[in-house]
Amino acid sequence: MKKLLTIILSCLCACSVHAIDPVKQSGQLQVKGAQLCDQQGQPVILRGVSLGWHNLWPRFYNKKAVQTLKQDWNCTVIRAAMGIMIEDNYLENPEFAMQCMTPVIEAAIKQNVYIIIDWHSHVTKTAEAKEFFGHMAQKYGKYPHVIYEIYNEPVEDSWTSLKKYATEVIGEIRKYDPDNVVLVGCPHWDQDIHLVADSPLQGFTNVMYTVHFYAATHGDSLRKRTEEAVKKDIPVFISESGVTEASGDGKIDAESEEKWVEMCERLGISWVCWSLSDKNESSSMLLPRATATGPWADDVIKVSGKLVKGLLKKYNTK
């Protein structure tokens, strides 16, 4: 624990705390080879936080929380995890889902921070995803802030079936939005990036593939697999990661997290950390007594949140 606290403090003290305007700075994102690039074609790394499931922690889906994450935590990207499973999910209650998602998306646009619209599911719902992302592309496709994550974490799907799904959903998005980046999940909880490397999608531009890691569970093996994919010119985006075990709970492994972040920085991979929520688990960053909006004092930020906030302040500073 002493070493963990030392790491947190060193991150917090390593740099200035001034926020930047990432969209004003980088503009329309594009993918060149394995690299996410800015409007000028220069490499860019996005770093930020994922909100928890909208249907479990809706109180954090508000414009002031977005403002806090951008201005106080130095996030350059925020992920809005729209739940497709569990009670009150988007399929059961789309009106409630959009009451949560819309303020976050529009606050991100106003704050000039990138926003990931995440279809947070573990099962395929092709028709529903096409309809949703078609609507999102029509409404928000004109904004360079928007990134579409079309499938959070496939579990049982083969890469062959995921390619078919992605082709249909991306095709629907591209009817209305030819440019904004699309994130595609890969098999087995976004672990099997090697299958993507052997047979990537064809016929689309500005597409990236997601890898998810939890530092106390995933180590050298997945890091090696990810690096090998990048060396094969596969553009990787870590749209969800945790400093804990894969369950979202358990021990915090700051040393493994440092290795992951070092690899991401070296390879130019963007990374997002899970989650802004108040669940009784170690990857949840806030205590239940934290306000819905922030700013959040240190006494309501849990150890994982302090570690993530410190890393963001260290790396997202110009």
PLM regions and their residue ranges:
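Active-site-adjacent substrate/metal-binding segments within catalytic domains
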Residues: K32-K110
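Alpha-helical transmembrane segments and their juxtamembrane interfaces
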Residues: L12-C13, N89, G250
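Sec-dependent N-terminal signal peptides
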Residues: L4-C13
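Active-site loop/turn elements of alpha/beta-hydrolase fold enzymes
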Residues: A80-M85, W119-H122, S241, L276
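Boundary at the C-terminal end of the N-terminal hydrophobic targeting segment
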Residues: V17-A19
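Metal-dependent enolase-superfamily TIM-barrel catalytic cores that perform enediolate-based chemistry
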Residues: N93-I117, S121-T126, M136, Y140
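Extracellular glycoside hydrolase catalytic/binding regions
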Residues: V23-L29, W53, P58, T76, ...
